[in-house]
Amino acid sequence: MKKTYISLWLLLTTTFAFFTVLSSQDTIKIAGIELAKPDIIEELTKATVAETTETEEIKTEDTGIDNAMITENEVVTDTLPKNILIFGDSMLEGLSPRLAAYAKHNGHTLYSVIWYSSTSKVWGTSTKLEEYISKFKPDFIFVSLGANEMFVKDIAKTRDEYVKTILSQIGDIPYIWIGPPNWKDDTGINELVKKNVPQGRFFLSKGMHFDRASDKVHPTRASAALWMDSVINWMAKNRNGEIRLTRPSKASGKADKTITLQPVN
């Protein structure tokens, strides 16, 4: 019985070796006669190639090429400490304390410049912004202007140049312009600013709910803090990680330096 198994094994081994040799030849010669390659050899070869191709495709998927492409598109937030400048009208009284808490929590330095009753015209005809940019060297700027221009007639014509001047002074510094917290319909200040700034640089506050102070105009401190939170949440979705502003545990803070300017007569 053992001899029978050994003979059968030798026969199978010889046959396999024979077919292997045949598979490497385009033609076969037996006793000087040239024969075509057997179909079975071609089919076996095709099957082997197909199987190898499928295996290579699976390996390619496992390399994580698709995952690498997704990683390239992910937003990477700049975690370096920044100098932040926020300037504008009296709305900063509510916005600055909450922004200061964010700045402190994330290792940034905040400079706040409040110019009471100021407008785009006041800032656009002054050199103050250029002076503060030169002095504080901000890496990021927040603008809060427009509340004192809610009802200016023909604002698109009369204030356009001033908005453009402010943006020119800001230059290449990343910024967000926070629109006024409308308590009534405006005559076009929001549209004017929106028209002049690139997409993702203007936060439209109009339409939000605000709890108002006794003057019925300014948001309460608590409501202004939520307003600032809304701005920063919006930034996370619309800006490409220009500055880290993770939410602080403290409700408010104090700017590293605050400058107040009185209304222009």
Indicate where each model-derived feature is located.
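Serine/threonine-rich low-complexity intrinsically disordered regions
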Residues: 1-2, 36-39, 66, 96, ...
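Conserved SGNH/GDSL esterase-like catalytic core that processes O-acyl groups on lipids
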Residues: 75-159, 184
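Short, structured coil/loop segments at alpha-helix boundaries
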Residues: 35, 69-74, 92, 155, ...
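N-terminal secretory targeting modules
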Residues: 1-83, 236-265
